[in-house]
């Protein structure tokens, strides 16, 4: 019996185009100004320090080449860090520090009314129905928890953060690693077999299934993956029968 549902965001509850064509470009436009600000807040400084630590431990050859060219390898300048972030963005590299910084920038954009998150029309009705059934709802996304909560706090359907009781990001572990889903099940306090994971990424579904979770592969118009493999396919959350 399913007692909890863990939802991906991009391509599952929110169109992939919002993330790729709105959120990421917005963060990139604000990145230099945010990093180079003389009066940057402490959370930005913390994200930058985390990025430097990640950079020094990044084994990728281009990352190390950039570090060697930095004016001070022990304490890269703001300009050096921007070059590193540009490299991560251009190559779609996953970075917890970059995600944190993007989340800070998006928070400013949401607060200013420059950003609003579109949801698929079936999402809120499904969340409401599951909540009424006593199902625990959680989020697992590669975006930071801050970014997740901002997205759901500023949707076209209003603030729906109260529908979710737990939030997970890459600090829990990689989404393609089965151990990450085992950690999530432990955090929720349920056996994996009692948890349903929904995502538009077949390999994420593979990892969740390996951990023992039930899975649904979500195929939406415009999603990058169309083959869900052995996972049961849905086209909207209303198709999920518990």
Swiss-Prot record:
InterPro entries: Enolase-ppase_E1, HAD-like_sf, HAD_sf. Transmembrane segments: none annotated. SUPFAM superfamilies: HAD-like. Keywords: Amino-acid biosynthesis, Hydrolase, Magnesium, Metal-binding, Methionine biosynthesis. Pathway: Amino-acid biosynthesis; L-methionine biosynthesis via salvage pathway; L-methionine from S-methyl-5-thio-alpha-D-ribose 1-phosphate: step 3/6; Amino-acid biosynthesis; L-methionine biosynthesis via salvage pathway; L-methionine from S-methyl-5-thio-alpha-D-ribose 1-phosphate: step 4/6. Its cofactor is Mg(2+). Binds 1 Mg(2+) ion per subunit. GO terms for molecular function: 2,3-diketo-5-methylthiopentyl-1-phosphate enolase activity; 2-hydroxy-3-keto-5-methylthiopentenyl-1-phosphate phosphatase activity; acireductone synthase activity; magnesium ion binding. It is an enzyme of class 3 (hydrolase). It comes from the Bacteria. It catalyses: 5-methylsulfanyl-2,3-dioxopentyl phosphate + H2O = 1,2-dihydroxy-5-(methylsulfanyl)pent-1-en-3-one + phosphate. GO terms for biological process: L-methionine salvage from methylthioadenosine. Its EC number is 3.1.3.77. Bifunctional enzyme that catalyzes the enolization of 2,3-diketo-5-methylthiopentyl-1-phosphate (DK-MTP-1-P) into the intermediate 2-hydroxy-3-keto-5-methylthiopentenyl-1-phosphate (HK-MTPenyl-1-P), which is then dephosphorylated to form the acireductone 1,2-dihydroxy-3-keto-5-methylthiopentene (DHK-MTPene). Belongs to the HAD-like hydrolase superfamily. MasA/MtnC family. Monomer. This is Enolase-phosphatase E1.
